[in-house]
C-alpha cells in the first residue's frame, strides 16, 4: 500500500515499533503526536464495525462515555444517541442480531460519544450496499458537521468524499515521494 494504515496508526499513537515517522501532528493548536494515545482524543471508525459482542448495544456505547458523566446522565446520553440514529429501543439488543448498517451506526455512535476532537474514518462505507451506503454516509457527515470536528477519511471511492472536502491522493503522493528519494 501507500501508507494509509501507517498514517492512521501514527495519528492515534499506535505506530508499531518497526516504523518511524518524522514531523508533527497538531490539533486545535496543540501538538498531539507527543501525547499518549488516550490524551490525543481522536476517534476512529473502521470498515468493520468493531463491537464487543459480549455486551449489549447500550453497554457498548456506555464504554465510550467520559468518566465525568455520571448516573442517569450516562444512560440518557446513550438513549439520546440511539434515538438520533434511528435505533431507539436497541439498548438491550445483542450486537450479533444487528444488520451491517446498524452495527456501523453503533460503532460510529461509540466513537462520537467519546467526544473526540477529530475523527478518522477508515473505509467506513465500503462494506455497505449502495442504498444503505448513501444514507449512512449522509448521516455520518451530518453528525460530524454538527460536532464541528475535523475528519480524515481513507476511501477508494470518491463518492464517499463530501463535495466541500480537500483530497490527498496518497497513491500519487507515494509515487512522487519515492521518485524523490
Tell what function each PLM region has.
Residues 148-154:
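Conserved H-loop
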Residues 94-98, 102:
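Conserved ABC ATPase signature
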Amino acid at each position: 500500500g501507500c501508507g494509509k494504515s501507517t498514517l492512521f496508526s501514527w495519528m492515534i499513537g499506535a505506530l508499531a515499533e518497526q516504523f518511524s515517522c518524522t514531523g508533527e501532528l497538531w490539533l486545535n493548536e496543540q501538538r498531539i503526536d507527543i501525547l499518549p494515545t488516550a490524551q490525543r482524543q481522536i476517534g476512529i471508525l473502521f470498515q468493520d464495525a468493531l463491537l464487543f459482542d459480549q455486551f449489549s448495544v447500550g453497554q457498548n456505547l456506555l464504554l465510550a462515555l467520559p468518566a465525568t458523566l455520571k448516573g442517569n446522565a450516562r444512560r440518557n446520553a446513550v438513549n439520546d444517541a440511539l434515538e438520533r440514529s434511528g435505533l431507539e429501543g436497541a439498548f438491550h439488543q445483542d450486537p450479533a442480531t444487528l444488520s451491517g448498517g446498524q452495527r456501523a451506526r453503533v460503532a460510529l455512535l461509540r466513537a462520537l460519544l467519546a467526544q473526540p476532537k477529530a475523527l478518522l474514518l477508515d473505509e467506513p462505507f465500503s462494506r455497505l450496499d449502495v442504498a444503505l451506503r448513501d444514507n449512512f454516509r449522509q448521516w455520518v457527515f451530518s453528525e460530524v458537521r454538527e460536532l464541528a470536528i475535523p475528519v480524515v477519511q481513507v476511501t477508494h471511492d470518491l463518492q464517499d468524499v463530501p463535495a466541500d472536502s480537500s483530497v490527498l491522493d496518497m497513491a500519487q503522493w507515494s509515487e512522487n515521494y519515492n521518485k524523490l528519494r
